[in-house]
Amino acid sequence: MNFFKKIGSNISLFFSRIILFFQKHFIDHFKNKVLLKRILFTLFLMVVFVTVGTLTLPGLKVNQDTSLSGGNEFFNIFNTIGGGGLRQFSLVSLGLSPFITSSIIMTFAQTKLVPPIQRLSQSGPHGRIKINYITYGLTFVFALVQAIVVIQTFTTGAANNQNQQLVTILDQFNTPVFIWFVLPFILVAGTFFTIFISEQITNKGVGNGTSILILTGVLITLPSYFINAYKHWIGDLTGKKLFEGVISFVVFIISVAIVILIISFFHQAERKIPLQHIGVGRSKHVKDLSYLPLKLNPAGVMPIIFASMLVTFPMMITNLVNQKFPSPGTAWMIENFALHKPIGLVIYAVSIFLITIFLGLQQSRLDKIVEDFNKNSTFIPGIRPGEQTEAYLMAVILRLSIFSAFYLTILGASQYFFQALGSPPNLIISGTSLVILVSVSIETIQQIQARHKSQNIFKTNNQTKKSFGFSSLVKATNPQNQQNDNGGSILW
């Protein structure tokens, strides 16, 4: 009897802890009206983006008997990164893809590779504004090129392996002016509308607007994998085969959950380098030192996204050229440079690996870290300030970048590796989608919690100023109260 009472008390304690956890991390946040407005504003713009993504371009008819972008690797990646608007060939079909491509190119350009852009990036707010103008100009160019390629590809049947025409232009709109000018500029306008929504989310909502809209596209496309898996393994089966199908489906769900947990661990993992400040005194314990946190994956998910666009977009143009002007050379390239073919898979994996290392070194901003060390009289114990510190940090960041390069290469290429082994493409969840799902979710939750804490501190400071009097003087001069306050304060 006591055994069952103990089990019951443990179960009740478990659920009470879960309730307290949600109350602490989620419910309390919604009591903050300012934060609640930001969250609701973000959700509203996400709904607007999804709604616009269901509106097909004027003058076009989407053929419902084919899966839009089925069998084409570029458009599957394009649809995920762009925000999912390509499914219905909507007003926002291009999504944020042109803007992301331009932003990554400008990230490369702000290094020593392009000295004028590097000087602009170091010239303060004025230079930052000029870089933004250049980024938007590149976005317009990329959006126009991608719009023409997408329209021509979908209307000629080059978007899938069966050469089926996925989009039909209605007879009254089937004119060169409409195809080559009106439709492309509508898609370009849709891209800048999407950028506008993302900027509003960044400024007035929660999280990074670009990441939130990409996450929206992932959330839209992700359920289809589970539906396809259910139909594949369970479907209309009965008896023993049904049991085996249920087991396979459960294993599939568990495998996805394990991958998500692994990605979560790698996303939050960091290398802590202990720091010492001149004049503070040397601490005997490492745990008492401040530290420099370096992300285990400093480049994030951008290497996979950029490598995907870099490798697949030229192949999409090659596919379109082969439709217009067939030749043995273009046919061979289409056959062998697909991502699920050995040559294409190797090129894709090597691209992810090299871009990860480059972006990892670029995003770490080593020169800025060393400069701050010199200004604040900070040094790493056992390492001399100056060139030795810079060399030490470079070696650490390079090792982290190489490790994350292997990690991202496995995640990005595994989808096409399993496809090359014969697995159905509609059952293989993209590692890119899972990385985006996990990283954006964690970063958004952390930003919500940070805003909640900062607003609470601001509110507490205001209340302290208003109530400052004899009682607060007594509290400030009481050593015991002062010690408790310091111990419970938040360093911001």
Describe each model-derived feature in a short phrase:
Residues 2-119, 126-492:
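N-terminal cationic and glycine-rich segments that engage phosphates or anionic surfaces
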